[in-house]
């Protein structure tokens, strides 16, 4: 009887075990970088919103009541010179709306992180000002 080339079941199990151990070691590092990238993207979007909001305030004299005021003239003022953001309002990297609350002289603008709720730690930590 002629022996054909191939792997035995034991050899395949050993290779699969080694691949599993490598995945267990490398996987968390890859997902950690993904999380850092999402947080960085949220910070960049918030900076873009801040610039657009400040430009809106220079034109209109106050901050918009909602972020939608950056893409549509919801102020009713002729001095509105938008849209101040191209296209639709972006969502945060986790698909949630940004939290925006204007007051007389400033505003609060935040991403609530992965869970979309105030507070939290690590991936769920709030990002913004």
Model-inferred region functions:
Residues 51-68:
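Alpha-helix exit/C-cap motif
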Residues 36-40, 47, 51-54, 76-78, ...:
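Short, surface-exposed interaction loops/tails
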Residues 2-30:
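N-terminal single-pass transmembrane signal-anchor helix
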Residues 69-79:
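Short, basic/aromatic beta-hairpin or loop at an interaction surface
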């Amino acid at each position: 009887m002629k022996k054909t080339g191939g792997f035995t079941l034991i050899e395949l199990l050993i290779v699969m075990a080694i691949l599993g151990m490598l995945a267990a070691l490398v996987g968390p590092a890859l997902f950690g970088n993904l999380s850092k990238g999402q947080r960085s993207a949220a910070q960049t979007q918030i900076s873009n919103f801040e610039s657009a909001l400040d430009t809106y305030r220079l034109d209109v004299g106050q901050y918009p009541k909602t972020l939608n005021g950056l893409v549509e003239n919801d102020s009713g003022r002729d001095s509105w010179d938008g849209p101040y953001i191209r296209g639709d309002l972006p969502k945060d990297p986790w698909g949630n709306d940004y939290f925006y609350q204007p007051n007389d002289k400033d505003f609060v603008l935040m991403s609530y992180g992965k869970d979309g709720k105030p507070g939290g730690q690590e991936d769920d930590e709030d990002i913004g000002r």
